[in-house]
Amino acid sequence: MDVPIAPDSSASVQRSPPELAHAGIEVSGLTKLYKEFTAVNNLSFAVRPGEVMGLVGPNGAGKTTTLRCLAGIIPPTRGTVQIVGHHLAADPVKAKQELAFFPDEPRLFEYLTVWQHLEFTARIYQVERYREIGAQLLEELEIADKRALLPGELSRGMKQKLVIACGLLHSPKVIFFDEPLTGLDPLGIRRMKDSIVRRAKEGAAVIISSHLLHLLEEVCSHVLILKNGQKVIHATLDEVRQKFSEAGAGTNLEEIFFRATADAKGPS
């Protein structure tokens, strides 16, 4: 199970207010090598509380590797990651207590019911009010009537919702999503967008990796575009739109993505 790691709103999230100006996620010089292959090359960026950053790039750009490094699942070769001020390498327990990572493939315990998954997660994170919070999450994600079912009795989308309910149970301040809408129907997609926006408004720093660029355009305040493991663009959506509008290009995120990755050079 991936969530315990130690785990209709169409308006984009706005920039964080001044009182939340410190970084929820701070990354400096992040590099990941696999022998001679550079999967991620010298990434530096920050995501503040209340911000939602879209992480996009072609297949093989390094998106999932970046997320796995940020979540502490794999160690970077070089560079540092801080989660709400906690150094991920030096203080991994405290750092991971503040985050939730949702992989693209939900992994659950075969012989635990939906509610037992929440109870298990609550014990890991010592969530005292887990009954109240868990019930609210199941209602929000529309699986409250599935609480007695085993994973084998759930659809792909319901499994994804259960993983998300477990990951949000301890109210993480930093949230990483890797393709969060896989397996969801249109109503589930709308609910998930609402949930992402709600967490950001409550002060979480959020990163979403997705190929669904129209989703990112609806919920993200910032975008980081990668190619060949390198940063191509990191800016607010408004700044990116302005830059490409001045260059005579279209200003929706899909057109910006194709233009930016076509113009970007590979690593030297």
What are these regions (language model features)?
Residues 71:
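Helix-to-loop junction immediately C-terminal to a conserved catalytic motif
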Residues 79-90, 94-95:
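Conserved ABC transporter NBD signature motif
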Residues 119, 123-146:
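Conserved ABC ATPase "signature" region
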Residues 150-157:
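Conserved ABC ATPase signature
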Residues 175-179:
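Catalytic Walker B motif of ABC-type/P-loop ATPase nucleotide-binding domains
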